[in-house]
Amino acid sequence: MRYLVTGATGFIGRRMLRHLTDGGHDVTALVRAIPALPGVRTAYGDLATGAGLLAAVQGVDRVIHLAGVTKAPSHHLYDRVNAEGTRRLCAALAALPEPPRLVHCSSLAAAGPGRQRREEEEPAPVSAYGRSKLGGEHALREVAHRVPGVIVRPPIVYGPGDREFLPRLVTAVRTGLLPAIGRRGPRHYSLIHVDDLCQALLTAADSGAPGAIYHVSDGTEHLWADIGAAVAAVLGRRAPRVVHIPGGVAVAAARVFGRGSVLNPDKVAEALHPAWTSAPGRLPFTPEITLPEGLRAALTA
C-alpha cells in the first residue's frame, strides 16, 4: 500500500513512519524541507500555502494527515495550519480523478470537555486549538462527495518522543506538586499511547466508514492524581500532591505569559474543565498498551 504522511517529522508522525515501514508499505513523507527520514521518500508540500500539494498526493492509496500545531501565538496561526491547511490538502485530493482514502487525526479538543464523550454528540470546543481542529473536520466534510475521509479524535497522546505532556509530568513529580487548575475535586482524562494511536489510525485507513468520526483511547478514565502517581512509580519517587490553582489566578498568569508559553490562555481554557474523556468508540480497534506499561517504556528508554 502506498501511503502519504503529513506531519511526518513530529512526535506522532515519526512513530507512524516506523509502523508503516515495519509493515512493508511504500511511504512518502510530506515535508517543507528535506530532513533525513530513513526508509521513506519525501515530497515537498506546504499546507500553509498549498504549494506542491497537488503533485505530492499523486499516486498514493492512503493519506494519514497528522500535521498541525498544538501551541500558537494567536488563533490565526491555529486556523492557518489546523483548519486552512487541512482544507488545502482536501482540495488537492478532491482534484484527483480517483482520490485516495484520507485519515484525519483531529483531537478530542474538537469535541469539547466532558465525561464519556461520544462521537455523535454535538461538538463544543472551548479553546482556539479545539475550534481549529473542528475547522479541519469541516474541511473534510466539504469534500466528502469526492474524498473518502475518516476522522479520528485522540485524547492526550504520550509515549517515546513526547516533548509536551510527559516532560511536564516528570517535572511535577520531581517537585512533588501536581498542578490542577480550577475548582477542587477529581479530574478525569483519557489517554492513548502513541503506538496504539498509530494502530488506530491504520485501522481507520483500512476499515473506517467514509464520513465517520471515531474516538479512540486506552479504554480507561484516568484520575489526574493517579496519572501523577503512575509517573512517580516509574521514577522511583513519591506520588506528587495535587495542588489546586484557582481559575482566576491561572487566567491572569496565562495573559502575562502569552500563547506561546506552556501556561497560555488556550491551555487554561481547557484545564478549567475537570473531565476530558471519551466513551469506547465504534472503531474496531483494541488498545494494547496500559498506562504503567507505556510510561515505563517511555521514561526508561
PLM feature spans:
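A hydrophobic C-terminal alpha-helical subdomain
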Residues: 247-286
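Conserved Rossmann-fold NAD(P)-dependent oxidoreductase catalytic core, especially the SDR/UDP-sugar
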Residues: 87-128
